[in-house]
Curated annotation (Swiss-Prot):
Major place of residence: cytoplasm
The keyword Signal is assigned to this record: no
HAMAP family: Malonate_deCO2ase_dsu (MF_00710)
Superkingdom classification of source: Bacteria
Keyword Phosphoprotein: yes
InterPro entries reported in the protein's UniProt record: Mal_deCO2ase/Cit_lyase_ACP (IPR023439), Malonate_deCO2ase_dsu (IPR009662)
Compartments (UniProt record): Cytoplasm
Entry GO CC: cytoplasm
Protein name: Malonate decarboxylase acyl carrier protein
Species per Swiss-Prot/TrEMBL record: Pseudomonas fluorescens (strain SBW25)
Molecular function per GO: acyl carrier activity
Residues with PTM O-(phosphoribosyl dephospho-coenzyme A)serine: 25
Length: 99
């Protein structure tokens, strides 16, 4: 089990919070909460050791297309594929009202 931390530039914090996914499904869960203006922080707890670079590249691809809101994101991962991670993040952004 590894804990990874990432930080990216962001816009303003949203008003809402969201919880998407389910750890019990062998997938992952993502908790999104308002953060500090201008900063997106992500903490990943993953069952896959040695995957920090893969996570870094995934987040860079997602956030190069859009400026994310200022959030604190906690991800609890149990071997989800990059596509599932992206899907869960997009679901979370939709729930908090960010395009």
């Amino acid at each position: 089990m590894e804990t990874l931390s990432f930080e990216f530039p962001a816009g303003q914090p949203p008003k809402g919070r969201a919880l998407v996914g389910c750890v019990g499904s062998g997938d992952l869960e993502v908790l999104l909460e308002p953060g500090t203006p201008g900063t997106l922080t992500i903490q990943v707890q993953t069952s896959v050791n040695g995957a920090e670079q893969r996570w870094q590249h995934l987040f860079e691809r997602i956030f190069q297309e859009q400026t994310p809101p200022a959030l604190n994101i906690d991800i609890h991962d149990f071997g989800a594929t990059p596509g599932v991670v992206r899907l869960r993040l997009e679901q979370g952004f939709e729930e908090i009202g960010h395009d």
